[in-house]
């Protein structure tokens, strides 16, 4: 079982065993200070300072949405949501950069550099196709609409607490 002790000797979790059926909706209730948030942080992998073992079935992923999510000031709603698919965003950006380099005289004059660039472009193209990255904007828009996020160009500094949580949830759900 999982155990958690806070210094000096406050045990909030003692010999906890949990199993969830596929598709089950789970609620965790308890008094203040009883370990609800601690348990969720352990399950999500945020808190690693505990005794015992947490095991997941293959293919499952776990996310954790804080009560007051941290959103980088100055960013727009869309920029925050894109953080959930940052690897795809970075791949698309690199693909654009590679394509721009095809016009570079240094590349045009060196067959080895041209071959390397063509190979990199092919690798990126495969990755883009495999992740359906060409449709990323419509996926983001659908996700933001489904969660009733504020307009994508709104700066997160001006959002209410509920709006901030919806934006953070959208980012979390888009993560792989």
What are these regions (language model features)?
Residues 1-176:
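ABC ATP-binding cassette signature C-motif
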């Amino acid at each position: 079982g999982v155990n958690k002790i806070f210094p000096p000797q406050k045990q909030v979790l003692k010999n906890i065993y949990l199993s969830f059926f596929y598709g089950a909706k789970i609620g965790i209730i308890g008094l203040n200070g009883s370990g609800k948030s601690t348990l969720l942080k352990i399950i999500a992998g945020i808190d690693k300072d505990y005794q015992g073992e947490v095991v997941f079935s293959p293919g499952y992923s776990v996310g954790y949405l804080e009560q007051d999510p941290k959103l980088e000031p100055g960013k727009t709603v869309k920029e925050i949501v894109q953080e959930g698919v940052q690897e795809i965003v970075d791949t698309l950006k690199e693909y654009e950069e590679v394509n721009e380099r095809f016009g570079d005289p240094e590349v045009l004059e060196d067959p080895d550099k041209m071959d390397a660039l063509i190979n990199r472009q092919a690798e990126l193209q495969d990755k883009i196709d495999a992740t359906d990255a060409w449709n990323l904007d419509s996926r983001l828009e659908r996700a933001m609409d489904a969660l009733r996020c504020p307009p994508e160009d709104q700066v997160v500094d001006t959002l209410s607490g509920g709006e901030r949580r919806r934006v953070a949830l959208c980012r979390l759900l888009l993560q792989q």
